Amino acid sequence: MVDLATVDYFSDQAVTQDPYAYYDYLRGCGPVFTEPHHGVVAVTGYDEVLAAFKDHESFSAVNAIGGPFPPLPFEPAGDDITEQIEAHRHEFPIFEHVVVMDPPAHTRARSLLAGLLTPKRLKENEEFIWRLTDTQLDEFIGTGACEFLFDYAKPYATLAITDLLGVPEEDRAEFRRALGAGHREGQHVGSLDGTPVGLNPLHYLDEKFSGYLTERRREPRGDVLSSLAAATYPDGSTPDLLEVVHPATFLFGAGQETVTKLLGAAVQTLGDRPDLQQTLRDNPALIPAFIEEALRIQSPTKIDFRLARKTTTLGGVPIKAGTVLMLCLGAANRDPRKFANPDEFRLDRKNVREHIAFGRGIHTCAGAPLARVEGRITIHRMLDRMRDIRISEAHHGPADRRRYSYEPTFLLRGLTELHIEFDPVG
């Protein structure tokens, strides 16, 4: 029996595979609790995580990706360290990307994304998503089996975002190969060895997207990249090229991670809960609720970080300026104070849309609407074209002794592989 009080969340391999007992332990110590190994304040309560997300005056997103790694590049001094944060911002991981910005810079950068993934544009793109879903399923459906992440989820997520953005057809195969190639320099996101993520792990995309956006500024094409190339700041000024390249590359890279992990969790649930398959076939209107519950119970982003810029309180607990906070989305979405029987997958959960898998407040995930569309259409077509979707016992063991492997990262929650078998329809 593991003594959870001794567990180091940031290096323990077992916790990456199943973090939920540890989250329960932390929550039992209090919804706002300082873990002993790194002095990080773990926020596990739903209300408390929500409050931190919404209070960007007190909590900076400057360390949202790295948390305690690397350590702060300065020694916090006083009850308001805003000036110190701004003086050292360029020393934090991915400092040029919107996910770690604070207002007013965040407000300006986010304004460039405001008109991109609108309901109207997603609706216009939906016909392509339906076609892409079938095209990707066609690659393996006749075999009655696949490794779902490699054969479907990863290429599908890449091709969906390349089409929506307007990446040229001739470059799409290259992106599919590159993004399936594994490790790239600077891509230590949530590494268990304490290695910090590089200052810009998406730099490999900058040259390509600089070219695309330069072309769109010269010759608009009516796609998302053209809208981004033409975007102006609220004051009417035109962004520099890199100021539009970075939102594009972040949307392109980070969005695929979220979609791939969501699809893996959803299909894993279908295989482990065969009773849900016919329920969803009989009533496809329940598929959106199924996707939301999959997001809640297996949040693709396990944690997000904040840095207290001011001495304040959270959930009645004093927080000193300079404190690193770990907002545990995976724990908050299973907080029994918010979600009844939180460890159960329930298709009829009335408040499921209140989960915070995509964050909340000014940093709500910009790609969330697209992820939901891709999840809904994928499950719909899989249920149409397959019967008896089941988890491969040869790879994952029998139903009562499943063996799943998750990515060894403290930040994200995603399977490393998912082997399924099924009976093709027709």
Please state what every model-predicted region is:
Residues M1-G426:
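Cytochrome P450
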